């Protein structure tokens, strides 16, 4: 049996990330990952950089941003438009294009101490048509647990692992509800 470890939700300099795809791939190799999927916000600019870099499979998709939900799409030829209110329409459009789609950070809570509390949870879940869901978005979970500036500073600079102990239970329960159908 083969086990492949990777990350399906990474941003580069093409949106709000801080590294080039080359730098991200080198870091992924150092961390022992087999693959990464670059999903910059509403852009496919990284597509020419797909391939194998530093022994890591690098794929490029997009995070389709809407106020009521964010959706990771892979194998898109162009960005999919979607209704702001109806996530099912977004899921259907991505699927009809032949792409794979994943619900991103479905239970994101945010913190008033970080980015003025902005978060992008899903308020309505699709019936079907998606490939999967992001069970654990470390950054979203971390931000949701920041309840003071002091705590944020301590966790960020001295003990990043203290705030996060695993995927949110509600995400696991949602996945279980879909897979038990």
PLM features: residue spans?
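A metal-dependent hydrolase metal-coordination microenvironment
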Residues: 1-181
């Amino acid at each position: 049996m083969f086990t492949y470890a990777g990350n399906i939700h990474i941003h580069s300099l093409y949106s709000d990330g801080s590294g080039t795809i080359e730098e991200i791939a080198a870091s992924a190799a150092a961390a022992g990952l087999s693959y990464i999927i670059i999903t910059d916000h509403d852009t496919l600019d990284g597509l020419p950089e797909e391939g194998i870099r530093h022994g890591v499979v690098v794929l490029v998709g997009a995070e389709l941003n809407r106020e009521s939900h964010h959706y990771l799409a892979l194998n898109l030829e162009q960005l999919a438009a979607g209704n702001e209110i109806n996530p099912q329409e977004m899921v259907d459009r991505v699927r009809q294009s032949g792409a794979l789609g994943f619900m991103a950070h479905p239970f994101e809570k945010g913190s008033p101490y970080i980015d003025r509390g902005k978060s992008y949870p899903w308020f309505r879940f699709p019936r079907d048509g998606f490939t999967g869901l992001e069970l654990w978005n470390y950054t979203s979970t971390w931000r949701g647990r920041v309840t003071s500036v002091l705590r944020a500073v301590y966790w960020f600079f001295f003990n990043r692992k203290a705030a996060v102990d695993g995927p949110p239970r509600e995400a696991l329960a949602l996945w279980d509800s879909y897979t038990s159908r």
